[in-house]
Regions:
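Short, surface-exposed loop or secondary-structure junction motifs
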Residues: 41-220, 225
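Short, gly/Ser/Thr-rich active-site loops of penicillin-recognizing serine hydrolases
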Residues: 244-262
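A short acidic/small-residue loop/turn micro-motif
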Residues: 157, 243-244
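Short amphipathic alpha-helical signal-transduction/dimerization elements
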Residues: 18, 181, 257-261
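Short active-site loop at a secondary-structure junction
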Residues: 1-46, 81-90, 161-164, 233-237
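Short, well-ordered beta-strand elements
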Residues: 225-227, 232-243
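Hydrophobic "lid"/C-terminal helical patch
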Residues: 14, 176-177, 256
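A generic beta-sheet turn/junction motif
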Residues: 16-18, 219, 230-231, 242
Length: 262
């Protein structure tokens, strides 16, 4: 499962809609979901950068949600909008962005993703959560005194539209980030607009540092880490089905980078 690494796919589709003049970074959330408190102050930029003032944990529905609109409504019914435009990481921002994509295009999230990213890049091993991926995906494990299967919550995954309901492989993910870097998906100016953030060092699914960027995705027993060291011209992807902490995962992938550089 791609987990939060999926956020950059959602952000890329938002930028594509901006390039088509169907949205702007200043478009207000109230245009699509006016019932959300302070939505008249929350912009697309705020949602992309987690500065919307929205807070939400990861509540799991009792049964799998079967369509995009039900996932968005689940988030709307469980989020809290505070009006404080400070950085606060929450999946709710990207679920709302995914919902905006469906409203602007009048298509499902997966249809837009397939048309604009999966098919052009030939990402044949990337798919949404459904019965086929459930049966074919790598299982996750807990390691203690005994090795046990991790109890995967498909109900939770079904609620994470745009931020945690995709499966992929390291090779497919590499094709995606490489396409961003070589401007196959977005022009230089569009990518610069999407990734511009000077306050939080986070924008559109990636954390930025002096010589590169990284992304982390931990969900449902899957642990995914991406590290792009531009000074060494190295992309590193680590996808695990066994638990490690966020800091351990980043340390592991940085150590891989050191080995490559040596």
């Amino acid at each position: 499962m791609l987990a939060s690494l999926q956020k950059s796919y959602t952000a890329t589709m938002i930028q594509m809609l901006i390039d088509q003049k169907k949205l702007s970074m200043n478009t207000k959330l109230s245009q699509f979901y006016p019932s959300i408190r302070y939505s008249n102050k929350i912009t697309i930029r705020n949602l992309l950068d987690h500065t919307s003032g929205i807070q939400m944990g990861e509540p799991a529905p009792k049964t799998m949600l079967t369509n995009d609109s039900s996932a968005v409504m689940w988030a709307i019914n469980h989020l809290k909008s505070t009006g404080r435009m400070q950085w606060n990481y929450t999946n709710a921002n990207y679920i709302l962005l995914a919902g905006i994509i469906t409203k602007v295009t009048n298509q499902s999230y997966m249809s837009v993703l397939s048309e604009n990213i999966l098919k052009p890049l030939k990402l044949r091993n990337t798919a949404e959560l459904d019965s086929n991926t459930i049966n074919s995906a790598a299982k996750t494990y807990n390691f203690g005194n005994n090795v046990t299967l991790h109890a995967m919550s498909y109900d939770l995954a079904s609620s994470e539209l745009g931020c945690g309901n995709l499966y992929t492989t390291p090779s497919d993910y590499l094709k995606f980030v490489s396409a961003l870097e070589d401007n196959s998906l977005l022009s230089i100016s569009s990518l610069n607009e999407l990734s511009r953030n000077h306050e939080t060092a986070y924008s559109a699914g990636f954390y930025y540092f002096s010589n590169g960027q990284r992304a982390d995705g931990i969900d449902n027993g899957y642990y995914n880490f991406y590290y792009d060291d531009k000074s060494e011209h190295a992309n590193m992807i680590l996808m695990l089905n066994k638990g490690v902490s966020d800091s351990q995962g980043r340390a592991m992938i940085q150590e891989l980078g050191n080995i490559i550089a040596s």
